[in-house]
């Protein structure tokens, strides 16, 4: 088995929350709302959303920002949530006692949440240089894309 070695990223930090007692499906509903947004905007959204899953995700985003400012010295205003993923964790199985000596199984699902924050100040510094590297005259307007539709081409099927 070949393992890909992870390269160090100098512009991103992450926070990982494991075994959070919530189903992965419910956590994904909240994560989809904040993916790709800035750090401050994500905190506001998480504070105002009425779901139970918002609080653990809020703590994770806040922890990732604390990692960014403490470990790498990034400013919180330049942070953007570049990657947010939810994976299914273990399912804790218990038995609930019921009447007449019976018992019903209870499944308590957990999930693992990963939040990756990226610093955008690097891109703002070198924005002019990156624009210079782009080829001049290459844009979507200059490409001539024509779609040939077989039904409106005046072929056999147009005549009745």
From Swiss-Prot:
The protein's assembly and partners: Part of the 50S ribosomal subunit.
InterPro entries, sorted: Ribosomal_uL22 (IPR001063), Ribosomal_uL22_bac/chlpt-type (IPR005727), Ribosomal_uL22_bac/org-type (IPR047867), Ribosomal_uL22_CS (IPR018260), Ribosomal_uL22_sf (IPR036394)
Keyword hit for Metal-binding: no
Domain of life: Eukaryota
Any one annotated GO CC term: chloroplast
Annotated disulfide bonds: none
PROSITE patterns, per the entry: RIBOSOMAL_L22
Species of the source: Arabis hirsuta
UniProt family annotation: Belongs to the universal ribosomal protein uL22 family.
PANTHER family for this protein: CHLOROPLAST 50S RIBOSOMAL PROTEIN L22-RELATED, LARGE RIBOSOMAL SUBUNIT PROTEIN UL22M
Function: This protein binds specifically to 23S rRNA. The globular domain of the protein is located near the polypeptide exit tunnel on the outside of the subunit, while an extended beta-hairpin is found that lines the wall of the exit tunnel in the center of the 70S ribosome.
Protein name: Large ribosomal subunit protein uL22c
GO biological process: translation
Subcellular location field: Plastid, Chloroplast
Keyword annotations from UniProtKB, A to Z: Chloroplast, Plastid, Ribonucleoprotein, Ribosomal protein, RNA-binding, rRNA-binding
Principal localisation: plastid
Record GO terms (molecular function): rRNA binding; structural constituent of ribosome
């Amino acid at each position: 088995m070949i393992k890909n070695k992870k390269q160090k990223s100098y512009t991103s930090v992450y926070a990982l929350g494991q075994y959070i007692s919530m189903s992965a499906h419910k956590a994904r509903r909240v994560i989809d709302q904040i993916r790709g947004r800035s750090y401050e905007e994500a905190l506001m959204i998480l504070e105002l959303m009425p779901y139970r899953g918002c609080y653990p995700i809020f703590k994770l985003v806040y922890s990732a920002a604390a990692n960014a400012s403490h470990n790498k010295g990034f400013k919180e205003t330049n942070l953007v949530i570049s990657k947010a993923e939810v994976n299914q964790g273990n399912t804790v199985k218990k038995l609930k006692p019921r009447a007449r000596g019976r018992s019903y199984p209870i499944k308590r699902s957990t999930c693992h949440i990963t939040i990756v924050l990226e610093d955008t100040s690097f891109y703002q510094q070198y924005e002019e240089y990156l624009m210079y590297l782009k080829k001049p005259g290459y844009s979507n307007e200059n490409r001539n894309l024509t779609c040939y539709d077989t039904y409106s081409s005046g072929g056999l099927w147009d005549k009745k």
